[in-house]
């Protein structure tokens, strides 16, 4: 499975290519975690798609220290490696609004759903059940789920489909034992973040973000 490292200091456009490289998040966690409050405050953009959908990150209200950044980076490295073993998942290491390591897992909607459908197929349920195990291991991880579509059909129809798909993924992950409180945002973005450089099929996707909760940050700060 492919893993890529991309760091965003402002609202960023996240794309996935045919191949990528893996970098360790620990050093980056130290670099960003040790920055000034002003520098961290500048990291304001959303990291879902082109940044227009949502910003992810716990509302901690202060810069996160170096040691905590390293610890969280280590946790996210582990989660990224585990998620990368799941068939049909694209894994990217990204940065949340606190400047901390986070993980984006993209599931191609062609794998999860039939055309214009939000019903999960049997193959996708196997992949999501495996992914649920990754999420259940650490209830201090916050989760955001975003659905995307291609441009076929009306804005309204695509918004509805993308929303239903995002909630279908959330609900199945919960059925597999993921704590409901971990889900901080679940929404459809339709084709508002359509990437013209990708195919229509690649734009039909569901993205799941794993990032540090306020509890995880507090625990990391206390331990460091």
Question: Where do the language-model regions lie?
Answer:
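Bacterial N-terminal signal peptides that target proteins for export
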Residues: 1-9
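C-terminal motif of bacterial Sec signal peptides marking the signal peptidase cleavage site
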Residues: 14-18
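Short, low-complexity, glycine-enriched hydrophobic/amphipathic alpha-helices that associate
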Residues: 20-82
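Amphipathic, membrane-active segments
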Residues: 75-104
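Solvent-exposed, polar/charged alpha-helical surfaces in well-ordered, non-transmembrane soluble domains
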Residues: 81, 85, 122, 126-133, ...
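Extracytoplasmic
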Residues: 86, 98-102, 106-108, 138-140, ...
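Periplasmic peptidoglycan-binding/anchoring modules of Gram-negative envelope and division proteins
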Residues: 112-147, 208, 215-224
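Periplasmic OmpA-like peptidoglycan-binding domain that tethers envelope proteins to the cell wall
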Residues: 148-219, 224
């Amino acid at each position: 499975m492919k893993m890529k490292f991309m760091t965003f200091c402002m609202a960023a456009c996240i794309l996935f290519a045919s191949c990528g490289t893996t970098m360790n998040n620990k050093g980056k966690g130290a670099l960003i975690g040790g920055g000034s409050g002003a520098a961290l405050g500048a990291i304001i953009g959303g990291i879902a798609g082109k940044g227009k959908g949502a910003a992810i990150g716990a509302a901690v209200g202060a810069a996160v220290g170096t040691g905590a950044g390293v610890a969280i980076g280590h946790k996210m490295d582990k989660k990224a490696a585990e998620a990368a073993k799941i068939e049909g998942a694209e894994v990217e290491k990204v940065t949340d609004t606190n400047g901390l390591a986070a993980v984006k897992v993209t599931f191609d909607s062609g794998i999860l759903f039939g055309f214009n459908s939000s019903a999960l197929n049997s193959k996708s349920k196997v992949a999501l059940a495996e992914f649920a195990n990754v999420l259940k291991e650490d209830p201090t991880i916050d989760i955001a789920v975003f659905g995307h579509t291609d441009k076929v059909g009306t804005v309204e129809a695509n918004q509805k489909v993308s929303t239903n798909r995002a909630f279908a993924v959330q609900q199945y992950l919960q059925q597999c034992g993921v704590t409901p409180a971990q889900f901080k945002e679940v929404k459809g973005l339709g084709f508002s973040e359509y990437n013209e450089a990708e195919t229509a099929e690649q734009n039909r996707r569901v993205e799941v973000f794993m990032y540090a909760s306020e509890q995880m940050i507090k625990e990391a700060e206390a331990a460091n």
